[in-house]
Swiss-Prot record:
Region (Flexible linker): 143-149
Domain I: region residues: 1-63
One GO CC term, this protein: Holliday junction helicase complex
A Pfam family this chain is assigned to: HHH_5
Organism of derivation: Anoxybacillus flavithermus (strain DSM 21510 / WK1)
Gene designation: ruvA
Written domain comment of the UniProt record: Has three domains with a flexible linker between the domains II and III and assumes an 'L' shape. Domain III is highly mobile and contacts RuvB.
Family membership: Belongs to the RuvA family.
Its biological purpose: The RuvA-RuvB-RuvC complex processes Holliday junction (HJ) DNA during genetic recombination and DNA repair, while the RuvA-RuvB complex plays an important role in the rescue of blocked DNA replication forks via replication fork reversal (RFR). RuvA specifically binds to HJ cruciform DNA, conferring on it an open structure. The RuvB hexamer acts as an ATP-dependent pump, pulling dsDNA into and through the RuvAB complex. HJ branch migration allows RuvC to scan DNA until it finds its consensus sequence, where it cleaves and resolves the cruciform DNA.
Annotated segments matching region Domain III: 149-197
NCBIfam families: ruvA
Primary localization: cytoplasm
Protein name (record): Holliday junction branch migration complex subunit RuvA
Amino acid sequence: MIEFIRGYVDYVCPEYVVIENNGVGYQIFTPNPFSFQMNKQQQIVVYTYQYVREDVLALYGFHTRQERMLFAKLLQVSGIGPKGALAILAAGQLEQLVEAIEAENDQFLCKFPGVGKKTARQMILDLKGKLQAIVPDAFPNLFTEPLEETNALSEAIEALKALGYADKEIQKVVPMLRQERLSTEGYIKLALQKLLK
């Protein structure tokens, strides 16, 4: 397995980049090839994933190890291949992607290219609880919320349950609530606005 390639950006097109290293040009498929355009003729490091099947041998490349790990995890989901995984990562919402999986927010996941209801549910089934080890360095605040905020949000969730809302309904709005810094009452008001839409 090739961990990374250090070289110069020789060529960029909509599907891939070519990284030149010691006279060899490596064709590397990436989520956003043009994000490498600014580094043209500069030495960079691309973290690679080697994809091997009977009729396919391809290199996929990423700016960070975390991005590469998410790509590898997405490939484990039934119904998602390399092109689909690249399209999801190309949306550039990695933190929101992980948060939506953890919160079982299939509506948000369906916003990603090529992800329908069935694939979104499969992503949650296959990946929930398996991404925390990948993302702490990249998204330090995702799994470590301030205690005061966590308590306020927890109290709001309990209040919504007491009002008769099901866990499934509540979990759909939790990612939106986590983006705010509110009191318990503030979280409840915001949640009700979202739930009553």
